[in-house]
Amino acid sequence: MELADIRREYTKGGLRRKDLKADPIDQFNLWLEQAVQAGMTDPTAMTVATVDENGMPFQRIVLLKSVDKDGFVFYTNLGSRKAQQLGHNSNISLHFPWHPLERQVHITGVAEKLTPMENMKYFTSRPKESQLAAIASKQSSRISARGVLEGKFLELKQKFAKGEIPMPTFWGGFRVKPQSIEFWQGGEHRLHDRFLFSNQEGEWDIDRLAP
């Protein structure tokens, strides 16, 4: 198999400046809604990139849980590698690959922790099994076998068979305050359309970038 021979044309249509919303959050919500309507698998899945203390980058797929004018929100174990890295360096990058629509969105910004009240509101809305899993898994730690994790889950399931499950102190969310948001639309002959929104003291500048 020759990887260099794997290619296709992008035919979904171009993106013009006049098509864009003035606010990139509004534009993002429009594209996200269209991704959902297109029946895409996991349209809220995004790559979250962070760096460790030595500048080594790490990436993982995380689900976006909310977005508004204040930023993009996701939740995680606060002892996880990404949370620890954000504690040392709050700079972060998000990437949404909406391949069926021939679109990408790339976001850079700064991550800040959510308030305990915000964490509690979302935690209590989760399915019971998801709440238990958040307690059972010490994310990114080494375990001897999957059975250890499953055993802990069953133990907690029996313990909290009745009543509410307490939110663990080591679980919570981050809000990514965007500094830049780039919208990418595939184009014919590799002449893709790219528009970069840059936050300048609360106002958004828009630039077209070469593909």
From Swiss-Prot:
Organism: Vibrio campbellii (strain ATCC BAA-1116)
Domain of life: Bacteria
Family annotation (InterPro entries): Pyridox_Oxase, Pyridox_Oxase_CS, Pyridox_Oxase_N, Pyridoxamine_oxidase_dimer_C, Split_barrel_FMN-bd
Cofactor detail note: Binds 1 FMN per subunit.
Family: Belongs to the pyridoxamine 5'-phosphate oxidase family.
Gene that encodes the chain: pdxH
Protein's recorded name: Pyridoxine/pyridoxamine 5'-phosphate oxidase
Subunit structure, interactors included: Homodimer.
Residues where FMN binds: 60-65, 75-76, 81-82, 104, 139-140, 184, 194
GO MF annotation, one: pyridoxamine phosphate oxidase activity
Catalytic activity: pyridoxamine 5'-phosphate + O2 + H2O = pyridoxal 5'-phosphate + H2O2 + NH4(+); pyridoxine 5'-phosphate + O2 = pyridoxal 5'-phosphate + H2O2
Protein purpose: Catalyzes the oxidation of either pyridoxine 5'-phosphate (PNP) or pyridoxamine 5'-phosphate (PMP) into pyridoxal 5'-phosphate (PLP).
Record pathway: Cofactor metabolism; pyridoxal 5'-phosphate salvage; pyridoxal 5'-phosphate from pyridoxamine 5'-phosphate: step 1/1; Cofactor metabolism; pyridoxal 5'-phosphate salvage; pyridoxal 5'-phosphate from pyridoxine 5'-phosphate: step 1/1
EC numbers: 1.4.3.5
UniProt cofactor(s): FMN
Database matches in Pfam families: PNP_phzG_C, PNPOx_N
